[in-house]
Amino acid sequence: MSSLLNFYRKVLNVPLSLLVKSRAIPTDPVKELNLNLEQPIIYVLPYTSQTDLLILQKNCLSLNLPDPLQNNELNGQSLPRYVFLDEGRRFFKSKGAKSETESIFYRYLDLHRNNESLDVQLIPASVLWGRSPGKESEPHLRLMSSFQRIISMIWFGRDNFVRFSQALSLKYMVAEHGADEGIAQKLARVAKIHFAKQRYSAMGPRLPDRQAMFNKIIQSPAIKAAIEEEAKTKKISIEKARQEAEKIVNEIAADVSHESLRIADRVLSWLWNKLYQGINVQNGDRVRKLALEGHEIVYVPCHRSHMDYLLLSYLLYHQGLVPPHIAAGINLNFFPAGPIFRSWGAFFIRRTFKGNRLYSTIFREYLAELFYRGYSVEYFIEGGRSRTGRLLEPKTGMMSMTLQALQRGLTRPISIVPVYIGYEHVLEVDTYAKELRGAEKEKENAGLVLRVIKKLKNLGQCYVNFAEPIQVNNYLNQHFPEWKESQAEDSRPKWLNEAVDSVAHQVMININKAAAINAKNLIGSVLLASRQRALAREQLIEQVDSYLQLFKNVSYSDDVIVPNDSAEEMLNHVLTLPRSGVISEKDSFGEMIRLDRESAVLMTYYRNNIQHLFVLPSLVASIILHHESVSKDLIIKTVNRIYPFLKAELFLHFEENDVRNQVEAILTEFSAQRIVKYESDVLQINRARVRALQLHAAGVREILQRYYISLSILLEHPEISRAALEKESRSIAQRLSILHGINAPEFFDKALFSTFSASLKAQGYFDSEGNCILEKAKEAEEILRSLISVEVQLTIQGAMEKVEEVENTETVVKTAEAVTEKNE
């Protein structure tokens, strides 16, 4: 039988080598699963299939894993390196696989009794042929027959995945549970349950019968009530209101097609190869673990580009997970993109629900139905794409609906997975710059898509990092324990608004904790720190090295992606990127690297992607630079006064009682790099490296100037309203940006001044009547003034005087007009 089986495998390998191209999940199992190749491995497959076994063998050999067809030689015994859990359907019906498997498990377990150094690693491995879960109306099919497998080989040969799961230590099993035959049987049962969960996590629930789903939604009590109200309000018939409801459901709902997803996989594989030199994915194991545990997963990425929609779904598919249903703006529902996106899982959402109860009720019910059926969901919490490269303030509507779904009695735990997405080049960045200069946003259409496609070329690297998940049930239990109290389905519990804001804010913090530093955003940050946007090559390399050491030795977060390349390699990479704006020039003194004028504004976008990572070191450097000699305690006191504003603006994760330790670590690192002198708790400038200190300090310069503008106005006009404060601050910032050549568009962004005024209120700078507390504001203003150049202070003071002159003139004119009217 063995010779016949070997012959069959050789024959079978011929069509497999021609028709099947499989991909391993994860791509580097030795590293990602922490496998010890010094210890024996046994692979467990879910059911008997020589085809799957040969595909597994091919993948193992390419990944430098032990060959499953070679036996493990242990203590004089020769044991197979693979087992099948179930017999299933197969060409060769030999021994009952299940009993044989239990026997092999027992023999492996028994070997551990008298060999303490032995630790066999049991690795579940499954081969997926296609990823379609089928439709709800279709019958459940168990395993494929021989003929079906041949057809699958032809049809799904390019859609084949080998999934390696976390290894189980048999040494641990024996130590905890013993090594008898009952444990071997239990091991087999646990493995079967694992494979069932794994299959579900890869394929997801069956696709809905769209019309049946529509009917269920329309028949829900909440929508029936909304239809009746619509008819009453608009004075139309119930039937007409119902037709309007059906039209809305059809406008919103996705229409997922697995065949469309397969085509998308081919198209997007071509697209990414054309666009990017590489796609770097981190922490995918976090999501796979949640999926295996049966969590309802909600992906919440930052929003940089329209590419985000496509990229995340593509990567999840290649991580062995189900692509989510994606909340897409209604602006993307144009022909032909709309129907295509809908077939890939997009459901469409209008920009505003205000004044349309029928629409908001239907959308809420549709989202709740997706959760109820077990589909993963994705939405962009910022509401739209960031034009500045910074995270925007979260829009909480979708988050509110997510928490309400939990309140309605969803049985599965919900986990929110924040996702950081970063690019070395964003396709729309030119458009963003125009919009920030005042141009109107161009409506998405087929022509715009074609123009973007023409730009497709080498765009460098792309980064996707799955941040620390937020398990909503646990989060609410910890922070809002009253959430479990029963509520009427149509009521809004008191805890909800605060909980929604809290979870949304934590999402933004976790996204920033997973930021990716790359060659372009780091080199761009250093060049923008120089007032002339140019540095000698040696100085640039030295400063990039300084940042790399800082990020590695004083980590912002364990999730941050820090490049392994040298500063030299990073610079050479950026110089090869098309339209990077980074130029190399030579003169008689050597090589200079500069940023061309037109690209300076665009480069601020990429700097802003990672500004939060270096803003605290930059603030510390700025304090030392302006004081020249300063005590550690004064540095910490100054940082503590400014940090709450930075935390609110940049979604920083350090709690205020952690800031001292972080500042001390930064000071130690600056001293180790000889950027400063650190003796007896006093910090002094090291004149030999003052340029490095200046470049570090520049990262927070414009932020401090913005804060100083607002506080100066507040001290001059303590009774000023928040709206007027924000407006006047923005006007002065615009003038300052022109006179001092500040290229960053966000410098006079009204949203940032709004965030700062809200922070002032939260930090107690206003009394209960909304008036400024002068003493506190004066202290903060003095701290900021000590960190800002005299030239900038004079410009701000001059601008304030101009504003006051204009206001006085306007007052005189209005008074004169009033007198004239009275006399007439």
Curated annotation (Swiss-Prot):
<comment type="pathway">
    <text>Phospholipid metabolism; CDP-diacylglycerol biosynthesis; CDP-diacylglycerol from sn-glycerol 3-phosphate: step 1/3.</text>
</comment>
<dbReference type="InterPro" id="IPR002123">
    <property type="entry name" value="Plipid/glycerol_acylTrfase"/>
</dbReference>
<protein>
    <recommendedName>
        <fullName>Glycerol-3-phosphate acyltransferase</fullName>
        <ecNumber>2.3.1.15</ecNumber>
    </recommendedName>
</protein>
<dbReference type="GO" id="GO:0005886">
    <property type="term" value="C:plasma membrane"/>
</dbReference>
<dbReference type="GO" id="GO:0004366">
    <property type="term" value="F:glycerol-3-phosphate O-acyltransferase activity"/>
</dbReference>
<dbReference type="Pfam" id="PF01553">
    <property type="entry name" value="Acyltransferase"/>
</dbReference>
<keyword id="KW-0808">Transferase</keyword>
<comment type="similarity">
    <text>Belongs to the GPAT/DAPAT family.</text>
</comment>
<dbReference type="Pfam" id="PF19277">
    <property type="entry name" value="GPAT_C"/>
</dbReference>
<dbReference type="InterPro" id="IPR028354">
    <property type="entry name" value="GPAT_PlsB"/>
</dbReference>
<keyword id="KW-1003">Cell membrane</keyword>
<keyword id="KW-0443">Lipid metabolism</keyword>
<keyword id="KW-0444">Lipid biosynthesis</keyword>
<keyword id="KW-0594">Phospholipid biosynthesis</keyword>
<keyword id="KW-0472">Membrane</keyword>
<keyword id="KW-0997">Cell inner membrane</keyword>
<keyword id="KW-1208">Phospholipid metabolism</keyword>
<dbReference type="InterPro" id="IPR041728">
    <property type="entry name" value="GPAT/DHAPAT_LPLAT"/>
</dbReference>
<dbReference type="InterPro" id="IPR045520">
    <property type="entry name" value="GPAT/DHAPAT_C"/>
</dbReference>
<dbReference type="GO" id="GO:0016024">
    <property type="term" value="P:CDP-diacylglycerol biosynthetic process"/>
</dbReference>
<keyword id="KW-0012">Acyltransferase</keyword>
<feature type="short sequence motif" description="HXXXXD motif">
    <location>
        <begin position="302"/>
        <end position="307"/>
    </location>
</feature>
<dbReference type="GO" id="GO:0006631">
    <property type="term" value="P:fatty acid metabolic process"/>
</dbReference>
<dbReference type="InterPro" id="IPR022284">
    <property type="entry name" value="GPAT/DHAPAT"/>
</dbReference>
